[in-house]
Swiss-Prot record:
Database matches in Gene3D superfamilies: Bira Bifunctional Protein, Domain 2, GAD-like domain, Nucleic acid-binding proteins
UniProt-listed Enzyme Commission number(s): 6.1.1.12
Gene Ontology terms: biological process: aspartyl-tRNA aminoacylation
Known function: Catalyzes the attachment of L-aspartate to tRNA(Asp) in a two-step reaction: L-aspartate is first activated by ATP to form Asp-AMP and then transferred to the acceptor end of tRNA(Asp).
Entry binding sites for ATP: R220, D221, E222, Q229, E483, G535, L536, D537, R538
Name of the featured protein: Aspartate--tRNA ligase
Binding-site list for L-aspartate: E174, R220, H449, R490
Primary residence: cytoplasm
Keyword set includes ATP-binding: yes
Natural source organism: Exiguobacterium sp. (strain ATCC BAA-1283 / AT1b)
Top EC class for this record: ligase
UniProt record similarity statement: Belongs to the class-II aminoacyl-tRNA synthetase family. Type 1 subfamily.
HAMAP family registered for this protein in UniProt: Asp_tRNA_synth_type1 (MF_00044)
Length: 590
């Protein structure tokens, strides 16, 4: 038997009485009163195949079939007596007339089903080709494919050109560490894998392409976490002559189409909420706030200043902050031990302590309540909009520590207390980022986005004298507390780009050596241009309701940037290294 008439998940009541030919894997086999039932699975779903004892040859063969065998089945579609409302094909079954075993299978080291979620991730990644057979993961990749196609079709309709940019590029100091590729032809020299197509897409604007996009593979050698991978995919977009407002409106329209095509959601707002970077940090302690719930940070400096609690006073005297979050109605649900665990959590973000108070009908209760007389207690209650039964949590430190620790605590409590409506998709634009940040350890400024972001022209006069106050013409798209992507207007004038390089610590010679091709391009009539890059893996993760980026990538790396399936990275032969003019110097492990 060759060929296939239908995919398994698409065998419906409309085919009753017809002969079909199906292919797939055995999800399970059951023997019941002489009848053999086989659940046959392909990527569209499962259909029940019935083998009757009167078909003796097929019945004998079916007795030898085990889970994950690959079958070719021919049979007639009939209505099921005992319907299964939990299956799309639950109203029908296929009475087998012929079965051919295309391939047998050993017992799999991991289950092919939801129960695989209880198996260690390392084992699932080692046998990723089996893990990917799971219907839940296959559904995620169907969603990913639909997302990519929707984006590609939308941008094509908007007259964007899809252009591929080089994978072997020049190493430039613009962000994380590069992955390097040695050149055999040019011994001792290296290519870098692109962290993004940033420079090439800007050069395409110089070339007059006007509107460009690419679903691009990118590589960053950085410390990993649940929502990061060393190789990832981004939707890369660049436009010339387009107003920032128009670009943002276009992205809003595109995301609306993605939500409708993938999840059937038609409630995505035509315009997304906007918030400045300063407001996001002030209210949520994060530049990518999850706005699906409250627990906002409250500045209580005016309410606690002078009360006599030395920790608060010392922070304020050293230009620090005292902020609180009001956990409404939870005072009785948090023991001292519970709060100690929260304190351990905030310590990871640099907080030296987590002060707390419980609000009662009589006033304030807790280890620092003695510092707040009736007047100060009332001021604090009013500042935090507190009522009896509320739990107040405080951090006093420098602004970055207050934001990081309370911002993270806010999200932790939001999840643990069930405050987040998981059915919501809250899109948000965060704007007016600072152009640069000063790192005290290095004693230098770093670009918050990248060195090619245009400073706000209103602030250009501050670039040399007060760079920390310069705003960038930059915008991040945030969804449910994740940064979906970042964009900006680009620098397109050589003198501004050179000033930016100088601010970031480049000498004139270093700037020309690293980016001379870009600086020269700016002298040949470069148009104003802007763009954005959206993380496709992260977008799919959110749409699929997943919490791990690895679930959205077919063959992902582990947290240590290794592939358990292929054992990459791995040593190579000395002859290969010699051909590449490379000698390794591995330090002995102590």
């Amino acid at each position: 038997m060759i060929g296939r008439t239908h995919m398994n998940g698409r065998v419906t009541e409309s085919l009753i009485g017809q002969e079909v030919q199906l292919k797939g894997w055995v999800q399970k086999r059951r023997d019941l009163g002489g009848l053999i039932f086989i659940d046959l699975r392909d990527r569209t779903g499962i259909v029940q195949v019935v083998v009757r004892p009167e078909n003796e040859a097929v019945h004998q063969l079916a007795e030898t079939i085990r889970s994950e065998y690959v079958l070719d089945v021919k049979g007639t579609v009939l209505e099921r007596e005992n319907k299964n409302p939990n299956m799309p094909t639950g109203n029908i079954e296929v009475i087998a007339s012929e079965i051919n075993i295309l391939n047998a299978a050993k017992m799999t080291p991991i289950p092919i089903g939801d129960e695989a979620e209880n198996v260690s991730e390392d084992l699932r990644l080692k046998y990723r080709y089996l893990d990917l057979r799971r219907p839940a993961l296959q559904e995620t990749f169907r969603l990913r494919s639909k997302t990519s196609n929707t984006i590609r079709n939308f941008l094509t309709e908007q007259e964007f050109l899809e252009v591929e940019t080089p994978i072997l590029t020049k190493s430039t100091p613009e962000g994380a560490r590069d992955y390097l590729v040695p050149s055999r032809v040019h011994g001792g020299e290296f290519y870098a894998l692109p962290q993004s197509p940033q420079l090439f897409k800007q050069l395409l604007m110089v070339a007059g392409f006007d509107r460009y996009f690419q679903i691009a593979r990118c590589f960053r050698d950085e410390d990993l976490r649940a929502d990061r991978q060393p190789e990832f995919t981004q939707v890369d977009i660049e436009t010339s002559f387009m107003d920032i407002e128009d670009l943002m409106a276009m992205m809003e329209s595109m995301m609306g189409q993605v939500m409708e095509s993938t999840l059937g959601r038609t409630d995505t707002p035509a315009k997304f909420e906007r918030m400045t970077h300063a407001e996001a940090m002030r209210r949520f302690g994060s530049d990518k706030p999850d706005t699906r719930f409250g627990l906002e940070l409250i500045d209580v400096a005016d309410a606690v200043k002078g009360a006599g609690f030395k920790v608060f006073d010392a922070a304020l005297e050293s230009n620090g902050q005292v902020k609180a979050i009001n956990v409404k109605g939870e005072a009785d649900n948090f023991s001292r031990k519970d709060i100690d665990k929260l304190q351990e959590f905030t310590a990871v973000y640099g907080a030296k302590g987590l002060a707390w108070l419980k609000v009662t009908a009589e006033g304030l209760n807790g280890p620092i309540a003695k510092f707040f007389d009736e007047t100060y207690a009332q001021k604090l209650i009013e500042a935090t909009n507190a009522e009896a039964g509320d739990l107040l949590l405080f951090v006093a430190s420098k602004p970055t520590v207050v934001a990081d620790s309370l911002g993270a605590l806010r999200v932790k409590l939001g999840h643990e207390l069930g405050l987040i409506d998981e059915s919501k998709f809250n899109f948000l634009w965060v704007t007016d980022f600072p152009l640069v940040t000063f790192e005290e350890e290095d004693g230098r400024f770093y670009a918050n986005h990248h060195p090619f972001t245009m400073p706000n022209r209103e602030d250009l006069h501050l670039l040399e004298t007060d760079p920390a106050s310069v705003r960038a013409v930059a915008y991040d798209l945030v969804l449910n507390g994740y940064e979906l992507g970042g964009g900006s207007q680009r620098i397109y004038e050589r003198d501004i780009q050179e000033r930016m390089f100088k601010l970031l610590g480049f000498t004139q010679e270093e700037a020309v050596e690293q980016f001379g091709f870009l600086l020269e391009a700016f002298e040949y009539g470069t148009p104003p241009h802007a763009g954005i890059a959206l993380g496709l893996d992260r977008l799919v993760m959110i749409l699929a309701g997943r919490s791990n980026l690895r679930d959205t990538i077919a063959f992902p790396k582990t947290a240590s940037a290794s592939c358990l399936l292929t054992q990459a990275p791995s040593p190579v032969a000395d002859a290969q290294l010699e051909e590449l003019s490379i000698r390794t110097a591995i330090k002995e492990k102590k």
